[in-house]
């Protein structure tokens, strides 16, 4: 029983195999294996026809050979030894490996058009988002109309109108309810009213209020005086004198 070595072929073994094939011819592989300890006849034959045979065509496959290879595979399937006979100088492994190369190439070619639409759509989506963000029209949850209803222009620009005053004082009055803000959506178009906490023209307002109060007091005094001048008739005294 011949023990077979499962390792790679060494250069010294390749040279000895070439000498034996030249001596015995590429036929009697069992006799050749006896001269190579650890190698079987099948191993010697495969090593010769796949690697060492000088008739092996090591040039790249041509387009004509590729078409013939695909046609032969449609007929014979994965019978690579039969297919290799149709290609002089090509080994079983050569035709098998190149068929897989052709299939991988076709897979890449067919998959490229499928990736283009998604890439284009993603790039166009990113471009549109950048345009919307640059123009100020981009929002996550609200449309432009809803944003106007919820945040009127006066409310958004409100802090900037009074940026020269004490912000702490402003916030205190804002949260204590001294500043009235209208958040109703149906009244968003109406102008918002604020108390004039800057104390502008407060004296004139006070004077108007005092004048109004004084006018009312004068009218009440005149009414009381008018009532005091009404003549009083003593009907009881008239009755007593008649009796």
Swiss-Prot record:
Species whose genome carries this gene: Arabidopsis thaliana (Mouse-ear cress)
Molecular function terms from GO: DNA binding; DNA-binding transcription factor activity; transcription cis-regulatory region binding
CDD domains linked to this entry: SANT
DNA-binding region (UniProt annotation): 29-51, 80-103
Record's signal peptide: none
Comp. bias regions, Basic and acidic residues: 216-227
Main location: nucleus
InterPro entries registered for this protein in UniProt: Homeodomain-like_sf, Myb_dom, MYB_TF, SANT/Myb
Reported tissue expression: In elongating stem internodes, expressed in developing protoxylem and elongating interfascicular fiber cells. In non-elongating internodes, expressed in developing metaxylem cells and interfascicular fibers. In roots, expressed in developing secondary xylem.
Gene: MYB54
Region (Disordered): 206-227
GO CC entries: nucleus
Name of protein: Transcription factor MYB54
């Amino acid at each position: 029983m011949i023990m077979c070595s499962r390792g790679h072929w060494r250069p010294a073994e390749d040279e000895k195999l070439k000498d034996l094939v030249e001596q015995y011819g590429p036929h009697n592989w069992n006799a050749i294996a006896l001269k190579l300890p650890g190698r079987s006849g099948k191993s010697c034959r495969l090593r010769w026809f796949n690697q060492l045979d000088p008739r092996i065509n090591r040039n790249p496959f041509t387009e004509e050979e590729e078409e013939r290879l695909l046609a032969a595979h449609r007929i014979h399937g994965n019978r690579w030894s039969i297919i290799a006979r149709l290609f002089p100088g090509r080994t079983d492994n050569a035709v098998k490996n190149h068929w897989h190369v052709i299939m991988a190439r076709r897979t890449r070619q067919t998959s490229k058009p499928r990736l283009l639409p998604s890439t284009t759509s993603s790039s166009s989506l990113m471009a549109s988002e950048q345009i919307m963000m640059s123009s100020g029209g981009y929002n996550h949850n609200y449309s432009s109309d809803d944003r106007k209803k919820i945040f009127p222009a006066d409310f958004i620009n409100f802090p900037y109108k009074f940026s020269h005053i004490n912000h702490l004082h402003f916030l205190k009055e804002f949260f204590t309810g001294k500043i009235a803000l209208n958040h109703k959506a149906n009244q968003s178009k109406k102008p918002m009213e604020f108390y004039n906490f800057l104390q502008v023209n407060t004296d004139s307002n006070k004077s108007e209020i005092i004048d109004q109060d004084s006018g009312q007091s004068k009218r009440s005094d005149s009414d009381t005086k008018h009532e005091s001048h009404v003549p009083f008739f003593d009907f009881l005294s008239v009755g007593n004198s008649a009796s």
